Amino acid sequence: MRLSLETRVAEDVTVISCKGRIAYGAEAAALSAEIAELVPQTRRVVIDLSGVEMIDAAGLGALISGVLTAQASQCSVELAAPGNLILELLELTKLISVFELYPTLDAATVASRGQAA
C-alpha cells in the first residue's frame, strides 16, 4: 500500500498520521517534504506510525532528516505508535536514541500537555 499522509493539529502539536509504507522513492520524499513544510510553523511534530506497514532505509532517512531539520528550527519531531518491526529496526540500526518515542498518539499528546505546564 502506498503512503498516505494526514496532517492535523491536536492540542499544541502537529500530527502527521502515516498509513502504508515509507519506502525509497515517492513515499519517503513525501514524508520529508511534509515535515520540512511543517517545521517552521510549529514547535512540535508527532509522526503517528500506527498505520505504517513497512519502512526501509530511505524511510528511516526521511525520519532522521526531519529530526535534523526540526532541531535547526527549535522544533521537535517525535514518533508515536511505532510497531514492533519499526522498533526492532530502530534498535538494530542503533537509531532508537535519535528519536523521542511514545507508545501511542495519546501518550504523545499527554506528554505535550505536561511540557506546556
Where in this protein do the model-derived segments appear?
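Non-catalytic signal-transmission and effector/linker regions of two-component phosphorelay proteins
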Residues: 1-9, 113-117
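STAS-typified acidic loop motif
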Residues: 5-33
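Ser/Thr-centric signal marking residues that sit
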Residues: 7, 93, 104
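Conserved catalytic submotifs in the C-terminal HATPase_c
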Residues: 10-11, 50, 82, 106
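Amphipathic alpha-helical interaction surfaces in cytosolic regulatory modules
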Residues: 22-99
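Short acidic-hydrophobic, aromatic-tinged amphipathic segments that line or gate anion-handling sites
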Residues: 100-104, 108
